[in-house]
C-alpha cells in the first residue's frame, strides 16, 4: 500500500484525506506540548491541503477522540498545575473543565468542521461483526473503524500513529 511523506501531498491519488485524531491535536491543541518541528510540519501540510482544496474527511469517531484526548490533556495539566491528584470524573465538575469543554467544542465547530466533509459509514450487523472478528488485534476498535472509513471513501489517512503501519490503506 502507498505510503506518502508530507511533502508529497500534491501527489495523492485518493479522493481525499482523513486526519486521524492525533493530527488534529497537533494542529489545534496547545496542551499537548508537542515537538515544535512536528507541529510546524503538519501545519504547513494542512495549509497546503486547504490551498489545493483537497477534500478532508472527518467523522464522529475521530471528533470524539479529539474531544476526549483534549479534555484528558487538560485534566492532566490542571492536576499538575494545582499540585493535586484528582479523578477525571471529579475534574469534570470543575470550572476549568467547563471552560475547556466550551473551548474544544468551539474548536471543532469553527476550525475543524468548516473545512471537512463528514464521512459516514452505516454499519449493518454483518459489517459490525466483521469489525469485532478482525484478526488484526494490534489496532483498537476505533482504528478498525477509521480504516473502514478510508476504504469506503477512497481516502489517504494522515496519522502519526504506528498502529496503522500494516493497514491496507494509503497513509
Predicted regions and their residues:
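Active-site regions of enzymes building and remodeling cell-envelope glycoconjugates
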Residues: 167-171
